[in-house]
Amino acid sequence: MAEAENIVVETAEKIFADLADAQTITHDKEGRWKAPLWQALSEAGLPLAWVSEEHGGSGVSLGDGFGVLGAAGRFAIAVPLAETMLAGWLLEQAGIASPDGEMTIAPANPRDRITRNADGTLSGRARGVPFAKAAKHIAVIASGPDGAVIALVDASKLRVEDHLNLANDANDTVIFDKVEPITVKPAPKGFDQSSLMLMGGVVRSLQIAGALESMLDISVRYAGERVAFEKPIAKFQAVQH
């Protein structure tokens, strides 16, 4: 298991290092680096890591996926990798096959609700949906008369109001106006919107942990290289504390 996890994470890190290093991203103001990065990630099966092979994915473990998310955080990858992984995981809970391409999830806010109407369509408003404008499909958990359902929706059928968060990442509002889903199935017993929120929190926490790890490495390296008064600043007692 540990060997498999190392292979998955090493593959992700190599792709990030080759196609999304800081210098490449900084010099490419138009974001042309994103398309080849996404293609490489897709060819490696990483966006659908948590989807079973039966449903079009790679079928790796949660732990493998967590390692990939930590690596994505270390490289500060601004593509919907985490969102697509989470969407695939959500669809897998109901046995729905995942399509190719970028995905995201809705709702992303615990106060928002998507409702399944009597005619099977979906209605509601979801705020703060990451990368909704870039997504080709959205995985949705909705409440219906018979309990929670999980649905796959064509993003082109939705109205998306694009916004940015403090990190300048897509943080959109998605309006469901009696939208007919591609596929809809009942959620597993005991699985509801709070289940998605909890998993989403884990996903973001792993990305944050990876980013903090990278920040620590950069700070320690800088302190060892930066010289003041003829010695590295890491040697100063104030810095060591």
Question: Which residue stretches match the model-derived regions?
Answer:
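Glycine-rich cofactor-pocket loops
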Residues: T24-R32, K189-G200, D217-H241
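Amphipathic, small/basic residue-rich leader segments at the start of a protein or domain
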Residues: M1-A78
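Short, contiguous, pocket-lining structural segments
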Residues: A4-V8, K29-W33, P130, R204-A211, ...
